[in-house]
């Protein structure tokens, strides 16, 4: 699992090794309220696995915002979307809001739940 905090205006870098492969999220980028934030996650296993994205606000449990690459759970605002192509998955927040400030975790698994 890799993570990136969306700090309006900062996204931070992290690389995490999981089950013999790595998921990598990019260096920091600036995001102002109302702008579009794109957080990428790359890994050699992603073409064969689904990407899941979690949002974790300070002091709170993680919340699933995108599953199976691009599906949005009920209750998650439409400004959150996901896509995946080749070895890269992307979480897009269109018109980022102040309340979107959080850590964002990229996680991958196949349909059977294998990491």
UniProtKB/Swiss-Prot annotation:
Biological process terms from the Gene Ontology for this record are: adaptive immune response; immune response
| Residue ranges, annotated region (Framework-1) | 20-41
Q: Where is this region: Complementarity-determining-2?
A: 68-70
InterPro entries to which the protein is assigned, alphabetical: Ig-like_dom (IPR007110), Ig-like_dom_sf (IPR036179), Ig-like_fold (IPR013783), Ig_sub (IPR003599), Ig_V-set (IPR013106), IgV_Light_Chain (IPR050150)
User: Which intervals of the chain are annotated as region Complementarity-determining-3?
Assistant: 107-115
Instruction: Assign the protein's first listed, main location to one coarse class.
Output: secreted
- Primary role: V region of the variable domain of immunoglobulin light chains that participates in the antigen recognition. Immunoglobulins, also known as antibodies, are membrane-bound or secreted glycoproteins produced by B lymphocytes. In the recognition phase of humoral immunity, the membrane-bound immunoglobulins serve as receptors which, upon binding of a specific antigen, trigger the clonal expansion and differentiation of B lymphocytes into immunoglobulins-secreting plasma cells.
Q: What is this protein called?
A: Immunoglobulin lambda variable 3-10
Q: Source species, please?
A: Homo sapiens
Tell me what gene encodes this. Answer: IGLV3-10
